[in-house]
């Protein structure tokens, strides 16, 4: 199948998901599929909740990239997948899956999709969202408390102990692998329009091959 795999990376709260959604709005309903890298956090049924809370979810080793790579290859070959569903409040994968059909454009967004070389190599176009650190932490606080059922104290502790140091060690350096750096994510309307136009051109080019 002549589809494109677009990667969107950036720090937690940078606006990656918003950018992915804004791009999807520029295309038809069946043209784009969104996949969150977070869905591929490793399963930890063997650990009690208290221990799962202490895990470093901002390190490359936290992700089951082998499964994501396999799923992207399946979609590329025109076959549907059952994507894992991650439960943020329980710090573990749920027993549910999300059925995803192939589409002309596959968008994968997350904090670390550009770190693993084999995964990074699958992306036809790589976008890094660069947002001020103060803005990122404020967005993360609001999101994790309101949308993910987290306590304020747990979000702050996680930010200081793992999110910030892992951003500096892995996320920020990974932007060197990007094809383009976009300030402020989905709030950058001009960038959204430019990217949508460029992706449309890439689709047309792929269909001519």
Regions found by a protein language model. Name each.
Residues 16:
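Conserved lysine of the Walker
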Residues 25-33:
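Post-Walker A helix-loop "phosphate-sensing" segment adjacent to the P-loop in P-loop NTPases
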Residues 19:
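Hydrophobic positions on the alpha1 helix immediately C-terminal to the Walker A/P-loop
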Residues 101-102, 142, 164-209:
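NTP-dependent small-molecule kinase module
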Residues 11:
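P-loop (Walker A) phosphate-binding loop of NTP-binding proteins
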Residues 94-148:
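ATP-dependent NMP and nucleoside kinases share a basic, alpha-helical "lid"
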Residues 33, 42, 46-88:
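Conserved nucleotide-sensing/catalytic segment adjacent to the nucleotide-binding pocket
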